[in-house]
């Protein structure tokens, strides 16, 4: 799990830094979403990345999009680390980006609308930001420690929760 692979020492970040990281993440997932949509429901090259039992598919699109995301992160934040699904971990200064280029590869491969791109940032102990983009619906979900939101096209809504004392 990615949480086990990030730095064990938390890195302090300011509110302004968090806002910048969130803007960057939102822009990047939307950017790669265009590439994903152009390849959705097309012929894909698929490999099995499992190490034994079962089938763990990875497509040429997974690899390409993760490479694009890694390159963008490295250009913008060269000191940050990266953990991704398709390539090895890249150590950094304690701030670590966590990438899943296609969360729902099987759905993507079969033309089903149950996939998206995940991008998050950890300070070494906790998540700082998280984004999930579904390009086929132009839906972006995001969260930081103090708020969360949903954007569809140009319309944005704050996501709220309420206390739940029991689950049953």
Describe the function of each predicted region.
Residues 42-44, 56, 106-107, 113, ...:
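Flexible, active-site-adjacent loop/turn segments at secondary-structure boundaries
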Residues 120-168:
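Acidic beta-strand-loop-alpha-helix segment within the catalytic core
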């Amino acid at each position: 799990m990615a949480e086990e692979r990030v730095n064990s020492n938390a890195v302090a970040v300011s509110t302004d830094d968090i806002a910048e990281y969130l803007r960057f993440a939102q822009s990047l997932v939307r950017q790669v979403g265009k590439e994903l949509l152009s390849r959705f429901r097309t012929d894909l090259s698929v490999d099995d990345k499992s190490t034994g039992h079962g089938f763990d598919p990875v497509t040429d699109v997974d690899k390409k999009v993760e490479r694009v995301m890694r390159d963008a992160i490295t250009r913008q934040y060269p000191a940050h680390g990266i953990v991704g699904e398709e390539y090895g971990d890249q150590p950094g200064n304690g701030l670590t980006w966590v990438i899943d280029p296609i969360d729902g590869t099987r759905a993507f491969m079969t033309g089903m609308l149950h996939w998206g791109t995940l991008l998050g940032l950890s300070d070494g102990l906790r998540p700082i930001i998280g984004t999930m983009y579904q390009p086929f619906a132009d839906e972006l979900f995001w969260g930081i420690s103090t708020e969360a939101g949903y954007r569809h096209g140009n319309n944005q809504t704050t996501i709220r929760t309420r206390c739940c004392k029991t689950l049953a």
